[in-house]
């Protein structure tokens, strides 16, 4: 029997993050994921120690020790009256902290320290931790949207199907990187079984047999892989990307398009903006 997997909608102007601007004294908490991209994380810690303005901030640094610990630390920061929580980590940690802060008056600050850094890149945050820390020092705010997938907030992407299967396999790898992701995609494509999705988007009903459906709040997965080039983090909408069936050789073409920002121009891709969407699947499948 069919299973409802996603009820997805954006929440407009739901999360603030720290941008360049006016300098102010603030109480903040810094959360560090110690297993996130070890080289980036170590450099981030050095840059925090060297460049964070101690005259402007009252702060403490806490490291996550177990799965979802960042959520607990973020809730503590809110209870303690912090005005911002700064996360030095990758997309997973950033999403945990951001989702916890969504709907509060506490801002999210990001020092990118992961392997993909999709949301950070979409927001124009420097991949250089020195500049990211200096950005925190300036302490200006920008408000962005979040998405809701089955009631759970997300900052960047949600989806079902092939890309979720690749992401699941990728996260289990000790060695990561562009080539590893490409090869895992090839392997998963050979094994992955497509299914038909029943979709209701803002009252429009249709069916699609597809490799995947992504719901994007921002343009990219990470590493400048632009799955939804026209997505905006502050337009009050989410961008749906439906990858229709394609011949095996087209994987190479689509992968190239993904990094050229032209995926939406492929005849195998359907994109549209929406405010609310419900997806029903033929069978349970991995999601993200």
What are these language model-derived features?
Residues 4, 10-12:
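Cationic, low-complexity basic patches in intrinsically disordered or flexible, solvent-exposed regions
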Residues 17-85:
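ATP/NTP phosphate-donor binding region
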Residues 34, 88-90, 111-113:
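Glycine-rich beta-strand-to-loop/alpha-helix junction loops that act as flexible
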Residues 41, 201, 232, 242-288:
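ATP/nucleoside-binding phosphotransfer catalytic cores, i.e., glycine-rich phosphate-binding loops
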Residues 55, 103-107, 113-212:
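Catalytic core of DAGKc-family lipid kinases
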Residues 92-106:
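Short Gly/Thr/Asp-enriched flexible loops that form oxyanion-binding sites at enzyme active sites
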Residues 159, 214-228:
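Glycine-rich phosphate/pyrophosphate-binding beta-alpha loops
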Residues 175-180, 229-249:
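Gly/Ser/Thr-rich active-site loops/lids in small-molecule metabolic enzymes
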